């Protein structure tokens, strides 16, 4: 009665699920660590699209997903049955080799949490009403689990002490504290955070400070004698140590930071602080969970590729024959490619056309809310600067002739991409008419600090990613009057995957930005001597005209791949048109290959370095290596 399909989650429904989980616990134990499992029934947060079983909830209500179905209210028999299920699952967890078993009441995603919160629980029996009644099921689950496996397993309780809704939800200093006081020393471990998931895994755009949850969770150690673990995108080792020394936490929880750098604890212990790849809080990892695809990370391109491609975050295959390699362009792809080629032992020449390393990472980090993203370039630049086999040249744009003069046989081209100025994007493959009537800008202009003139600014977001709303917020914060036009039905729909969309749109509304959804810009025209944009409704609604002095187009990017194309052409004609030897290999990477997220660019750069001079058969196998269903079951 709890299935999140199509999301890919582990299951412990019956004994058949134990062997796969045992493989994990055995590996964890081989490294001297404890294995923990979080048992969860998702209540009305379940989709049950796979099982087709009606979802369960404290009170009847609509499902959390966009599907016209409701969860049914649990009766007393359902509650007894649920307790039995949970207890049996705890026993299976013990059999699978887990050392710590969780009862889960967080993120507004579990039945215990739903029972605990009045907005979900309108019962009038002993499981509803007062806090003591609403907490009853959670207390019973903790006691049931202790009884079943407490002789050999620790029982942990994950609890969101604050919903960050003020008086409209649970608050840490009121019912949140009361829950901890009422359960106090029943769990063996308190794992505390805030809810919902968008608050617990907040992006750096909206929660830039490391340890932002501490103000909500710091009371817990004062109330219980049991150890406490907490989270909050804790990336600073100094802060981690401080929280321990101050008695705020006993253990540091580092989920996203450990995705960015799985060797985070080792590097702290060994005082290798400069080698830590710090999480940037972009939530690309979260987006993959929401999409039901293998996890990935902007900072750590090996994440999710350990088995499929055999990549390791700290190790890489040494070069067969160390030789010079040229990387043209020092954005995220070029930096990562250069770093990994150097780690392999090649002599790397890194050429950057501008006076600063980092490319789009530096540009985007200049915008409001994205400063922490600069860590992507900071980490790689520092590592490259420590290496004797790397030579970096700034203010060094290279054309074909100059590349040939260098005489380097292997070239990687990471020359990025530029935003279009003609309006071509998702909704239209033809340019917007009349663009010559106003000043036209793109995110490239805004990120470089170009000053916009007076008068109303219209931002046209036909990309539907994150950047359009960032630019709108940035310009509004500078005091400009901004209107936001998008072909989507909401602002920046991609940010739903990163748990930010509501905050994004709320922020623009609070800034006074006019929002026009389901609209495309067909053309520019004049009315009463003023220039404006003609807005067309996707669904045939009434056309609108909007005054516009400056138009910022966030529609699509064009790869800056001319250098690659010219070098490739020389290879095509076997150098017949060149008086000098041509490179043996030319590889296009990053946005120059295919514009995407910064995470995509970093991955592309890493892939280029990994697969350089690799066995083609191994590369091909890595691309298609996948899990296959067994026909013997």
Predicted features and spans:
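A conserved short coil-to-beta-strand element within the FAD-binding core of flavoproteins
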Residues: 393-406, 517-531
């Amino acid at each position: 009665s709890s299935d999140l399909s199509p999301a890919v989650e582990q299951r412990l429904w019956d004994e058949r699920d134990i062997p796969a989980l045992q493989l994990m616990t055995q590996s964890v134990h081989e490294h001297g660590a404890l294995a923990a499992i979080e048992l969860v029934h998702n209540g009305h947060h379940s989709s049950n699209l796979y099982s087709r079983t009606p979802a369960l909830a404290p009170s009847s209500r609509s499902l959390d997903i966009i599907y016209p179905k409701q969860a049914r209210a649990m009766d007393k028999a359902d509650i007894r049955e649920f307790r039995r299920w949970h207890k049996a699952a705890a026993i299976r967890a013990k059999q699978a080799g887990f050392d710590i078993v969780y009862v889960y009441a967080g993120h507004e995603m579990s039945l215990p949490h739903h029972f605990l919160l009045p907005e979900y629980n309108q019962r009038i029996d002993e499981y509803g009403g007062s806090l003591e009644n609403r907490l009853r099921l959670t207390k019973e689950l903790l006691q049931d689990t202790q009884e079943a496996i407490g002789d050999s397993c620790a029982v942990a309780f994950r609890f969101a002490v604050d919903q960050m809704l003020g008086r409209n939800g649970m608050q840490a200093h009121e019912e949140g504290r009361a829950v901890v006081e009422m359960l106090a020393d029943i769990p063996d471990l308190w794992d505390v955070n805030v809810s919902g998931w968008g608050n617990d895994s907040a992006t750096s755009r909206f929660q830039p400070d490391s340890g932002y949850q501490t103000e909500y969770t710091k009371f817990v150690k004062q109330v219980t004698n049991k150890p406490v673990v907490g989270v909050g995108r804790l990336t600073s080792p100094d802060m981690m140590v401080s929280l321990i020394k101050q008695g705020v936490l006993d253990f540091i929880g580092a989920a996203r930071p450990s995705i960015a750098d799985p060797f985070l604890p080792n590097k702290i212990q060994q005082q290798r602080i400069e080698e830590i790849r710090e999480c940037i809080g972009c939530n690309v990892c979260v987006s993959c969970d929401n999409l039901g695809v293998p996890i990935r990370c902007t900072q750590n391109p090996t994440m999710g590729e350990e088995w499929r491609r055999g990549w390791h975050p700290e190790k890489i295959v040494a070069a067969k024959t160390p030789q010079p390699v040229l990387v043209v362009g020092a954005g995220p792809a070029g930096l990562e490619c250069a770093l990994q080629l150097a780690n392999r032992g090649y002599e790397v020449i890194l050429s950057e056309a501008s006076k600063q390393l980092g490319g789009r990472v530096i540009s985007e980090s200049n915008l409001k809310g994205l400063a922490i993203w600069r860590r992507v370039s900071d980490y790689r630049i520092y590592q490259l600067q420590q290496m004797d086999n790397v030579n970096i040249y700034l203010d060094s744009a290279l054309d074909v002739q100059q590349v040939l003069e260098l005489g380097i046989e292997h070239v990687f081209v990471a020359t990025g991409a530029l935003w279009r100025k003609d309006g071509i994007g998702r909704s239209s493959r033809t340019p917007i008419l009349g663009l010559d009537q106003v000043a036209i800008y793109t995110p490239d202009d805004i990120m470089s600090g170009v000053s916009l003139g007076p008068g109303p600014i219209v931002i046209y977001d036909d990309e539907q990613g994150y950047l359009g709303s960032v630019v709108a917020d940035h310009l509004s914060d500078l005091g400009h009057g901004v209107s936001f036009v998008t072909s989507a039905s909401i602002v920046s729909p991609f940010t739903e995957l990163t748990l930010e969309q509501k905050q994004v749109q709320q922020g623009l509304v609070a800034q006074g930005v006019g929002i026009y959804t389901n609209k495309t810009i067909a053309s520019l025209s004049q009315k009463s001597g003023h220039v404006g944009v003609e807005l067309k409704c996707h669904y045939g609604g009434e056309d609108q005209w909007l005054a516009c002095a400056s138009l910022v187009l966030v529609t699509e990017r064009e790869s800056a791949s001319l250098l690659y194309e010219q070098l490739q052409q020389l290879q095509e004609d076997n150098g017949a048109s060149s008086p000098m030897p041509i490179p043996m290999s030319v590889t296009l990477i990053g946005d120059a290959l295919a514009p995407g997220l910064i995470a995509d660019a970093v991955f592309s750069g890493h892939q280029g370095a990994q697969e350089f001079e690799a066995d083609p058969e191994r590369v091909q196998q890595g691309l298609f290596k996948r899990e296959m269903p067994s026909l013997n079951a």
